[in-house]
Curated annotation (Swiss-Prot):
A GO CC annotation given for this chain: catalytic step 2 spliceosome
Record GO terms (molecular function): ATP binding; ATP hydrolysis activity; mRNA binding; RNA helicase activity
Gene name of this polypeptide: prp28
Signal sequence residues: none
Gene3D superfamilies linked to this entry: P-loop containing nucleotide triphosphate hydrolases
Enzyme class: hydrolase
Protein's organism: Aspergillus fumigatus (strain ATCC MYA-4609 / CBS 101355 / FGSC A1100 / Af293)
Domain notes: The Q motif is unique to and characteristic of the DEAD box family of RNA helicases and controls ATP binding and hydrolysis.
Disordered: annotated segments: 1-81, 113-211, 760-796
Designated name of the protein: Pre-mRNA-splicing ATP-dependent RNA helicase prp28
The organism's taxonomic lineage, starting at the top: Eukaryota, Fungi, Dikarya, Ascomycota, Pezizomycotina
A GO biological process held by the record: mRNA splicing, via spliceosome
């Protein structure tokens, strides 16, 4: 500064002498060589040769530029705006252009990047002083006490170049503050692939998704882990933090002791029959009685009469109230109080199902049937206490002049269900014996039955009602001469009961005409078709007059329209509905109502079915002897066989056991058949041995046991066989001997036993191979029946 002032020109540079060189410490001597090392060569003391003369002269030494704060700097000129914009555009254009990198360059960049990451990770791993201590083992300066002015002073640790390559974390004055930044997180491990980190994360996500799917598939097929302690059924303990526990009881409430509103209830007194809403019938009865007493006290004569009327009105109101009617059973209600729900329950109780237009409701009792009083008296005299399900449903429909198809199990009272409407129909017609020409025009009604025995049985049942009413009933069956039957028809007959074959013979011989027939009943229609009577049935129905045939329109479902004109009425009863029966029904019936009791083809629920696997005639005879001698079953008993030549043999065996027996098959004459049935019905014979001839329609009262010595060829025949017992609501037992030759019906038999609530399927039948699936060839006949004595021919 003194030199600058003395020269008088403070801006001129002043040349100062160079500073004296600092004395460096002497270099330590080199370490002594090892013994095994070779000695160094001696120093070269020779003088170097002079430079050659032809060498060019050395350039003059370049003048050393002054470096430092005193050096002259060029004047900085500011950049113009145009220059800045141009540079910016050039930089953007260069950045927008794709930069090509060769494979070697990409590998080099990746290796350098990987090397830096490895080096950073190694430094972070080898640095043990991240908890506040420096590398020399001393405590970090950040833990020293603060200075009085609030700053933390750090002790210098040497030049920056000698601080073990520490990364600066900010200005030196703020480097040891408490709000210093935390060290950066360690970098993620990367593979030596040439792809970027996005590919690795995508691959990792795909692997995680695949692992999750594999876990779900394993859980689906292997189930949940058994070590899991979770249980859906385990009761969870509820928290009690929201449950308020009262510290007093309801008995401690003293508000009712001193408040008169709680001590006595206010009663609103109404003079009249009015009352407050919301009270039960007991309160209404009390108010009505109170009002009646008030009327009696006011006026002894007129008031007492009025009081009785009010009490009677209240009683009727209580009985007819909706709430009371809903609580009552249908048997306790009046007919006008029956609702749709009650009728539905009623049909379910009796297993009744109806379809076919507007079908009337069933009748609950004989009094509600709509029959004339004279017929109701006859019903009571005959002994019909309660109507059967088919009678409950069929009689109201038939009384409306509707065509009817009744599908019901055997022994369900079908005879009375069509006889009673028939008698009502013909009772409104003129008497047939009034004029001679009316006798010759034929009957008013015909009843077709498949067998002679069934026809005669229907005749016996019909005479119980026709004789008191003055109607004539004639049966036309085989086994009797035409002259005898013609003599029976000399005075005419309102009702003719016949088999199809004999009735066709009478029509062809001109013994009978159907000019005024207006009521047709086909009983056991499926059995008639099964016996080959389809063609005779068609001939009979085609011989009927067409003048009174119903129209095949919706008017056939209108009961009022049918009653206004005397149309022909057709009824068909069957236990099953094969295709041939359906074909006849579609051809000759007009918009029929269909009534089904139970299910078509089912056995009666009152019959207990037992099946025993017994092979061989001798074993079966021995088992039959044990059953008859057990005393469990009282006569009469029916034993069914498949072929007629076995009937006499089984009957002889039964007689040797000490029981009386008769036979019934196709080789018997009509007189022999009638005598056999009469002996069984009057109790003079214990056992009836028969073929399928007696399987349908034969009503022997109080049959306690049916034995199928040979299993029937079809499940339908089996159903009608066992239907000979358990009739009219009574219970019965059916025992069947089964063998391997009955494989065709084992499956259907097992299904029928499973549907029966009181029957059991034996293990031999349940596990039999033929009972596992339905045979493909259908209901084929067995080879035993192909010897000329067929079960469905006239040779039974």
């Amino acid at each position: 500064m003194d030199g600058i002032i003395s020269n008088g020109s403070p801006g001129a540079p002043v040349t100062q002498p160079p500073p004296e060189p600092l004395e460096r410490p002497p270099t330590p001597p080199p370490p002594p060589p090892e013994d095994s090392a070779a000695p160094p060569p001696p120093p070269d003391t020779s003088v170097p040769p002079p430079p050659p003369e032809d060498a060019p002269p050395a350039p003059p030494p370049e003048k050393k530029k002054k470096v430092g704060w005193g050096a002259k700097r060029p004047a900085a000129t500011p950049l113009s705006v145009e220059e800045l914009v141009r540079k910016k555009r050039e930089a953007d254009a260069a950045a927008a252009k794709p930069k090509f990198l060769s494979k070697a360059e990409r590998e080099r960049i990746a290796l350098e990047k990987r090397a830096k990451e490895v080096e950073a990770g190694r430094r972070l791993k080898l640095d043990p002083f991240t908890d506040g201590t420096d590398r020399s083992g001393t405590q970090s300066p950040s833990v020293y006490p603060e200075t009085p002015n609030g700053d933390e002073r750090s002790i210098p640790t040497g030049p920056r170049a000698m601080r073990n390559s520490e990364v600066p974390t900010g200005p030196a004055a703020m480097r040891n503050k408490t709000y210093d930044m935390s060290p950066p997180p360690p970098p993620k491990a990367m593979s030596f692939s040439l792809t970027d980190g996005k590919g690795d994360s995508k691959r990792q996500a795909e692997e995680d998704e695949a692992a999750a799917q594999a876990a779900l598939i394993k859980q689906k097929y292997m189930g949940t882990e058994k070590t899991s302690s979770f249980s859906a059924k385990k009761k969870r303990k509820r928290t009690t933090d929201r449950k308020f526990n009262f510290e007093w009881n309801a008995e401690e409430d003293t508000s009712g002791d001193y408040n008169p509103l709680y001590q006595q209830r206010h009663e609103a007194n109404f003079y009249g029959r009015g009352r407050l809403a919301g009270f039960g019938d007991d309160v209404a009865d009390t108010l009505a009685q109170k009002y009646a007493r008030a009327l009696e006290d006011r006026d002894r004569e007129a008031g007492s009469i009025r009081a009785r009327e009010i009490l009677e009105m209240e009683r009727r109101r209580r009985e007819e109230s909706t709430r009371n009617q809903l609580d009552k059973h249908w048997s306790e209600k009046k007919l006008e109080h029956m609702r749709e729900r009650d009728w539905r329950i009623f049909k379910e109780d009796f297993n009744i199902s109806t379809k076919g237009g507007s079908v009337p409701n069933p009748m609950r009792s004989w009094e509600e049937s709509g029959l004339p009083k004279r017929l109701l008296e006859l019903v009571d005299q005959v002994g019909y206490k309660e109507p059967t399900p088919i009678q409950r449903a069929a009689i109201p429909i038939a009384l409306q002049s509707r065509d009817l198809i009744g599908v019901a199990v055997t022994g369900s009272g079908k005879t009375a269900s069509f006889l009673l409407p028939l008698l009502v129909y013909i009772s409104e017609l003129p008497r047939i014996d009034e004029f001679e020409w009316r006798k010759n025009d034929g009957p008013y009604a015909i009843v077709l039955a498949p067998t002679r025995e069934l026809a005669q049985q229907i005749e016996i049942e019909a005479r119980k009602f026709t004789q008191p009413l003055g109607f004539n009933v004639v049966s036309i069956v085989g086994g009797h001469s035409f002259e005898e039957q013609a003599y029976s028809l000399r005075n005419g007959a309102e009702i003719i009961i016949a088999t199809p074959g004999r009735l066709v013979d009478c029509i062809e011989r001109r013994l009978l005409v159907l000019s005024q027939c207006c009521y047709v009943i086909m009983d056991e229609a499926d059995r008639m078709i099964d016996l080959g009577f389809e063609e005779p049935v068609n001939k009979i129905l085609d011989a009927l007059p067409v003048t009174n045939e119903k129209p095949d329109t919706e008017e056939a479902e209108n009961s009022a329209a049918m009653r206004s004109h005397r149309y022909r009425q057709t009824m068909m009863y069957t236990a099953t509905m094969p295709s041939a029966v359906e074909r006849i029904a579609r051809k000759y019936l007009r918009r029929p109502a269909i009534v089904t009791i139970g299910s078509a083809g089912e056995a009666v629920d009152t019959v207990e079915q037992r099946v025993e696997m017994i092979a061989g005639e001798d074993k079966r005879k021995k088992r039959l002897a044990d059953i008859l001698s057990s005393g469990e079953f009282r006569p009469p008993i029916i034993v069914f066989v498949n072929i007629k030549r076995n009937c006499d043999a089984i009957a002889r065996e039964i007689k040797q056991m000490g029981f009386s027996s008769v036979t019934l098959h196709g080789s018997k004459t009509q007189e022999q058949r009638e005598a056999a049935l009469a002996s069984v019905r009057n109790g003079s014979t214990d056992v009836l041995v028969a073929t399928d001839l007696a399987g349908r329609g034969i009503d022997v009262p109080d049959v306690s046991l049916v034995v199928n010595f040979n299993m029937a060829n079809s499940i339908e025949s089996y159903t009608h066989r066992i239907g000979r017992t358990g009739r009219a609501g009574k219970s019965g037992v059916a025992i069947t001997f089964l063998g391997n030759e009955d494989a065709d019906v084992m499956y259907d038999l097992k299904q029928m036993l499973m549907k029966s609530p009181i029957s059991r399927v034996p293990e031999e039948l349940r596990k039999h191979e033929a009972a596992q699936s339905k045979p493909n060839r259908g209901l084929a006949k067995k080879s035993d029946d192909s010897s000329g004595f067929g079960t469905k021919s006239g040779w039974q």
